UniProtKB/Swiss-Prot annotation:
Its main location: nucleus. The keyword Nucleus applies. The keyword Nucleus applies. Residues 1-21, 237-266, 278-298 are annotated as: Disordered. Residues 10-21, 246-259 have a biased composition (Polar residues). This is Uncharacterized protein C16C6.04. Keywords: Nucleus. It comes from the Eukaryota. Residues 287-298 have a biased composition (Basic residues). GO terms for cellular component: nucleus; site of double-strand break. The lineage of its organism: Eukaryota, Fungi, Dikarya, Ascomycota, Taphrinomycotina. It is found in: Nucleus.
Amino acid sequence: MDSFHPTPGKPTTATSNSSLNFFVRNREKSIRCSSLHQTFTAPSPEASPSIGLRYVNYSMSDETDESMFPLDSELTDMEDDDTEYISDSTTDLPSAAMARGTRQLSYNENLDQRSFSKTPNKHIEVKNLKDLCSPSHSGRISKSLCPVLRRKSLLPKPKMFQRVASALYEESSPLELEIRSESEFSKMFFEPKKSSSFVSRAASPAMVGPGVPFYSSITGANGNVLAPSGSLKAVENSDVIESSAEDSSNTDNPSTKPSNEMPISPLLSSSVFFKDTEMSTPNSNHSRSRTPSSKKRTRWGEEIIDLSKRRAVSPSIYYDLDKKCSPIHSVMVSPLKIKDTHEVLMNLKL
């Protein structure tokens, strides 16, 4: 029997067709699977340039239905603030762009309308700085400003400017500021001499102008330092000091008058104890020749009686009223008798 031997390199048609169909079918299947995978996972068309996107539409609707197609994200959004649309045509701009242009124009016009100084490096006195920083007479800023500059948080704050101006003024004249503060302190605490009762109102530091030196305004013709005007009222209110001043002027000579006498506070001179001692003592030459400092010493001794009423003293601390006390600090010289709190608590126990 003759057997059929196919020639090598030339396969039969049945086997060749079946193998070719197998490879072609598998190749189409792999292409379909890869394209389907790319439609769901590829982020952009650039990821697979060789194969175009195939959109799978599962709906049975018309082919014109674009519900499954994605939106075109490459189109520029006209309402976006970052991108500005530039029209190629010669038509007018939209109203929003016109409003933006007019706003910029109004801002530039307002810059031109403001009165800036021609010489910015001009020397400005510190005293005129408060007038420059103070607000206008109307107290309102003109409404011609654009809405951005009309915002309240961006407006100039005049109080802050005035604080800075006052701080600069204090730095420029520290000596004058210190003298004025000391004069206000002496108003409250010190009593004037007799010659100050005839001083006019111009001697008060409040009436002195800024250009007038303060020392020349408070010194009299004889070179004596005059007291401020606030303490003159204390002399008018206290009759005791006026009577003692008249007595001392009649008896004592100004040349023999001691120069280092302690000034009496007007607050203490109007106290009840000082007037009671003056009324109770007889009008003798010895009482007239006493200086205010000696009256102050006696008054300290009598005022210590009511010291426990004025101060909040613990009941466990007590002292004898017969003991002497120092007139300067009003503190008892003798050691205080202090009860031990432990003993008090032991006595309170039942």
